[in-house]
């Protein structure tokens, strides 16, 4: 990637306006193991949907390195989870297993582990995987090398500091936002899941550095929070917006309230980064949902946020009719890339889910829309009235951030001119460069780790070996070699291609 | 390390920042420091040169790399151990210092001269330091000296962990204040990190030490933990205050405390969960005791004890909310919120079957791939238990069913597991084959299920719509609706009008094909009524209250505005009779006509309100009687009417009313209004179909829809298939079309009311339709039957051509007889119809007798 793109990343900090026609640089985080976690028979939450989404992306050719960068995430370490969650809660999640849980009823109750949030095999590893992907995506946005970062396995917005809730154990969104706040003064969080994003809202309820906006079904519906009068508290007053909606809302009604509100929010708040939780249970036909959005209507929100050209983090969320979830998120990945995908689905190993039409589009039903125009107008006026009470963007100068952002660049150039050509290699290099050692020592470590990475990549590609599940730290070696189930040849080729492409610059002679 | 002295001074802060930002860099540095301290100089130089070579050979395998390094480190067991730890991703210093700390504590415990009380006191000091109750290292050293001061060798060994930290503290501060760091300062920075890690090792041991505590010690631990949590709250407040103070400082100064904070947190080990920990957890906050700030949030009491996080960053502490909690209700996994139809449930079952099948297949496949990888990488000298994830173990357990747990235990105990792995792998692959076959079976079954259920799963409206529509199509509802609807309508799509006419013509031709002439009349009649609707705007100009019928809101002048040519050319009425009908309709007898219409349909139930209406009509009847005095001369006719009325117990006046209603039964404004309304509804629905088809992707969906509708009318397709077609090609909003067949039936019925001469044949029509349907089912030679029908039509047309008026008179006579006999009248009616048929077959001579009789009567 040439230096000018780094400059473009810097421009995004200033919210430079760009046309929609311009391509966005997109990175996509996916762990091949995520689809194997199993909440239990009959449980609506199915991480398998993320694997289905990935298969669609592969067969549509979106995983090609020319289109977007595909990354396998580093699992979040326990310390990383404790940036938000309490020590005891994380310790319990790490220790509990289906066999040991029976003797810890009190702890299960305390941490709200139960039917909605069961203990299943690999629970802690699952949390590490999706949280690591969200934090990794936020880091990518901070680097300025990408405009949009995607993690469909994340978006678990109900988890609280010391308890699980609504199928969510670790709140990866809060962790990602904390990461974004290291660089950006203000971060906007938008939640279009049908359920209210209570965990994220609670975490940032008293601060003005994060604005939370949630569009959700309200009234005798989980989690029961999200009243329009919940507007934030203390320093966070008016930085929390709740848009309560009713059953059967359709595309036109939804956009008639989403676009005016978000336009005003972007104008008044001017966030440095946006996190959009794309829960797909607001689609028509969802097993647990009661809205009537079509796939195109749901993706219209993504398209709208993309048009602002602000660093954008796309996360998954709810979504319990998995044939609709996979198509929706595949379509939205295409929206992020600016790709027009053909309606007819390409054949893939999950093709039978999508009959009888085998169409990329999720159709709306004819259910009654209980949101009257009058009600929606009242809600909109109420929200816009709260927005008018905001101070017009906090008075912190952007210039103060620019020197800090640029500070690392000259040193990197001096130490290793090749780094600019391989940002991910930059991450790898940073991992092993000790301070105070000679250039020779630096070269030693670079060589050691790089050789290991390259060798493992080749092994995986040639023999389709499953990577051993080591501790969190060694996963740095796999950063450039995201992996797919070996049986899908197309997937394997598509997934490994980015790794190969990234290795080429590194292997060029100095 | 010496060579790094040449680095530019202004680069130091950023380097330090990046070092602290990334744990892997720190670990690499630790690794190199340890290796250098363990190895002789020449071996270390050799090591460094080998690293350079390895880097240059980019295609070297991992195993070969390790082989080279281990060869260099041969004879240095500690260095090899450090290298192994490094490869596995652990902190080399941490591991080494943990071992030393453990050794130290064990020897202190084993020393007979140190009492148990003193030993526990030592552990207590370390535990407090770990929980930040003792804040400074100086204090730790001071307390330790008091406890073991009498044993110099132990104290001296303990100082290995402490003195470096103390000595490094001052130079570290100096380096912070100075923008450029000297060579000596860098050395101290390195040692500082080393010292911190040593302390870290000690803390780990302190934690382990608590596990060995006596019951008394356990109680003390509980108290300490409680105090620790309280301190954590105070600590947080202190941190906030510190943050406020630090904010005004320069940016460069802000960076150091933050980075240092991160470093400290990274070094601390995570809390280990134990079952005893469960009892120490503070209870969850009871929202009912808290003050609500906004509807979903309550404010925590200030003294509230909540679970804390020791690893929050400065940023997190300043931003994250810990003073309010939201109050949730309900469960996300709850199905009651949305009514789903059975088709949707069928779709979900199919999806679940595919999902469960895929999960089994994918997990077994992942486990098999993992074991293959193990075999390839480690051969037979591997403790498999250490590498298996919980998911892999669960698969193996399921693989062997009841013996699964035994198999896992055997794996963990066995030294040589290569043969076991081979067996497991074989079984896994076999299982994968079975699951793959099951998946293929599902692939064949699912398409049918989803095809049959998908389109209907999108339909949530049609069941209730069908019920409502039946009620909406009743004459009462249509009339009420008609009054409320504005008559000024613009119907811009002439093609829809044509379609309405064509479809009704088709429907009528399907229902009765024995008489060609009436069919032709119906076609033109529909066109006439459809075109009449274009004139409704004109009607408004002439509408006045006095002239509006109170029941249907239609102007009584409606008939006057119908073009005479339309009625004259298309109806069998003579001009004289048309004039007569118009004159009669201007009277107020229309309301009574309405009542009779309802009686015929079996919907009319007499009540007080209706009787009052009848009473109000009496004076008008008198007036009409005097106007048309010529009727009073027919004594015989009047007498027969009176007889029939007496049977129902009516008075003489009611008898007159009834007689007059009979005369007007054939056509009334209400009947016309109902027909117009039905045609209007039909127009609107065909318009919906046309609009939906324009949005559909299929080309010319509207034409296909009309074909399908005709198939439904003639019985070649059923309602279910018709609805499926609409949902598939026109989308889920096409549910308003599902009742079109019933709507068309009502239109046909309503048309029959308007044409009096055909009224008696309504029963005949139904019989014909039933017979025809029966024949369609039994007789495949439909064209032949149509030919026969055509001949029959020609015959009847010829027969009627010679005596157009006589049949009408005959029918009137028959109808009179029917009324006088009640239920048995129906049987007589059939008898008369059969007699009529025989009369027709006999030819013109048979008509002369009844004809002459009627003339004499008139």
Swiss-Prot record, chain A:
Swiss-Prot/TrEMBL keywords: Chromatin regulator, Hydrolase, Metal-binding, Nucleus, Repressor, Transcription, Transcription regulation, Zinc
Stated family: Belongs to the histone deacetylase family. HD Type 1 subfamily.
Top EC group: hydrolase
Enzyme Commission number(s) from the entry: 3.5.1.98
A cellular component annotation (GO) from this entry: nucleus
Compartments it resides in: Nucleus
MF-aspect GO terms: histone deacetylase activity; histone deacetylase activity, hydrolytic mechanism; zinc ion binding
Name by which UniProt lists this protein: Histone deacetylase 3
Note: Plants silencing HDAC3 exhibit reduced peduncle elongation and fertility.
Residues the record marks as active site: 158 (proton donor/acceptor)
GO biological process annotation, one example: epigenetic regulation of gene expression
Bias (Low complexity) ranges: 485-503
Protein role: Responsible for the deacetylation of lysine residues on the N-terminal part of the core histones (H2A, H2B, H3 and H4). Histone deacetylation gives a tag for epigenetic repression and plays an important role in transcriptional regulation, cell cycle progression and developmental events. Histone deacetylases act via the formation of large multiprotein complexes.
Cofactor annotation remark: Binds 1 zinc ion per subunit.
Expression triggers: Induced by drought and salt stresses.
Residues the UniProt record annotates as site (Polarizes the scissile carbonyl of the substrate): 320
